[in-house]
Amino acid sequence: SGIATDWNFAYRQAHTKLVTIAHQDDIYNPNYLEEMLDALNRANDPILAHSAYYEIRDGKPVYKNRLLTIKKLLLLPFTTRKTWNSIFLRRRSLSFGCGICCPSVTYVKARLPEEPFTVGCKADLDWEAWERYSKLSGAFCYVKKPVMGHRVHEESETSHVIGENNGRSPEDYAMYRKFWPEWMAKLLMHFYQKGQDSNQL
C-alpha cells in the first residue's frame, strides 16, 4: 500500500463524471463546487480543474507565505481562460515546480485512466501525474480564488517524506530531469529544496 494506492482506490469508488479526492482535515469552502463547475463548463475539452488555496496551520487560515507566493507565480499564466489549453505553457509551469495543489483538483474521469496515480511515488505522485496529463490536448482549468484550505501539520504524509533522509529529493530531481538537462535540474533543486521548509512546522 501507499499514497498512490489509496488515492487510486478512492478515485475508483466514485461513479460520477467528476471526482475530487478530499484529503483528511482539508477544508472546502461552500463555493468550491460552484467555482469548479463554472470553470469546467466554460472550458474547451477540460481534463481537470484546480484552484488557488490557503494553508491551515494550528487551526488558522494562512493566505500568504513563501510557498503560496511561489505557487501563485507558477500559475500566473493561467489566470485567463485563453491559456488553459496551452500544452506549452503548462509544461513550462510544471518544469519549475508543482504549483497545483492536489486536494484542490477536480478530475474529469472520461479524460483520465482508471488509476491516475503511479504506484511507487511517495511525495511527487501528484506532480508526476500532472506532468503526464500536461501532454494531453484539453484544458487544465484554474480558479484563481482560494476556495479550499490545505492543512499543514507534523503528521501529514508530505511532512513525513520530507523529514526522511533523501526521502523526497530523488523524486524531485527525477521530475526536473523530465524537463531539463542535468545541470539545470541540479540548479533548480537547490532552490526547490528551500521551499520544502514551508511544509514543516
Task: Identify what each model region corresponds to.
Residues T16, A43-P46, G138:
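Short, high-confidence coil segments that cap the C-terminus of an alpha-helix
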Residues V19:
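Short aromatic/hydrophobic "clamp" motif used to bind/position activated sugar donors
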